[in-house]
Design a protein with these regions (language model features):
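A structural micro-motif
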Residues: 1, 27, 49-50, 87-88, ...
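NAD(P)+-binding Rossmann beta1-loop-alpha1 motif at the extreme N-terminus of oxidoreductases
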Residues: 1-53, 57, 178-181
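Solvent-exposed alpha-helices and their adjacent loops that cap or buttress functional pockets
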Residues: 4, 23, 82-83, 104-105, ...
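A general structural signal for well-ordered alpha-helical segments in protein cores
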Residues: 12, 39, 62, 74, ...
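Rossmann-like NAD(P)(H) cofactor-binding subdomain of soluble oxidoreductases
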Residues: 15, 38, 45, 54-129
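Small-residue helix-packing motif on alpha-helices
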Residues: 29, 39, 58, 74, ...
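Internal alpha-helical scaffold of NAD(P)-dependent oxidoreductase catalytic cores
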Residues: 100-110, 125-159, 163-207, 247-255
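NAD(P)-dependent Rossmann-like dehydrogenase/reductase catalytic/cofactor-binding core
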Residues: 194, 198-256
Length: 256
């Protein structure tokens, strides 16, 4: 299997790192040099990875094509590229919907939208795909947990929640900075906060049948967790989180 990546940002990097360390059998990975630094890092990391400057040559050389560019760049260059029916085309582009992708690609190839996140480099996390595709599902199951979505409108909800990655990291950063200001060394602060949230995430994953129950069980009457969650609710933290999600969803729905 020969794979081609149009766009070499952080997501492409994470996906490729996951592929290299997985059981996926591939003979070659061709990457563009849109991000010269990342492209060079990847090509040096594995002999099977080669940089090709011409996007069309990448497409001509592979069976699977991954579109990992911004929406603005995607709308500009995809329609100029020539695809074939044999191609399996996987788009990581958030706001270019299937109808527009088909219009740009022109041929009746297998086209799938996917939502990979950075932990895919560790072969962890969910990878929502639309529409369901057996080959693509098998591929991504080597890199995490594939979630098949039958309705594109429903898939927008998954794109929305994936936008909470940066806010999550901002929470980790804010809490680690708070510890640092209280006199804790940076390394210790970051290690504690990240380890704490990893443990909480694993615990919630193993008990995910009822997240609301977890919220209740993690509090004791007049305890510290009860105080924190009550104060954050009063401040509108969770209400604003919902508002932000709705705002992101509206943006995705407006995209053509």
């Amino acid at each position: 299997m020969k794979l081609g990546f149009i766009g070499t940002g952080e997501i492409s990097k994470a996906v490729i790192q996951g592929i290299i360390s997985s059981k996926i059998k591939f003979s070659k990975i061709y990457i563009s040099n849109r991000n010269n630094k990342i492209s060079k890092q990847l090509s040096k990391s594995n002999k099977k990875i080669s940089i090709i400057k011409d996007n069309q040559k990448i497409i001509d050389a592979c069976e699977w094509v991954f579109l990992a560019i911004t929406p603005a760049v995607g709308k500009k260059i995809i329609k100029e590229l020539k695809f074939k029916k044999k191609h399996t085309i996987i788009s990581f582009i958030s706001t270019i919907k299937m109808k527009e992708l088909k219009k740009f690609i022109k041929v009746k190839a297998a086209i799938v939208r996917a939502i990979p996140l950075p932990p895919i480099s560790l072969k962890k996390g969910p990878i929502p795909i639309y529409p369901p595709n057996k080959k693509v599902k098998r591929f991504f199951n080597n890199l995490g947990t594939t979630v098949e979505i039958k309705n594109e409108a429903l898939s927008l909800n998954f794109w929305t929640t994936s936008s909470m990655m940066a806010p999550f990291y901002e929470i980790l950063y804010t809490l680690s900075q708070w510890l640092i200001k209280k006199g804790v060394k940076k390394e210790s602060a970051q290690k504690y906060i990240t380890s704490l949230f990893v443990a909480l995430s694993e615990d919630s994953f193993n008990k995910s049948s009822d997240l609301k129950k977890l919220v209740k069980e993690s509090q004791t009457p007049k305890g510290l967790n009860e105080q924190s969650v009550k104060e954050l609710r009063k401040l509108g933290f969770y209400r604003d989180l919902n508002k932000t999600a709705e705002s992101v969803l509206r943006r995705l729905k407006k995209a053509k």
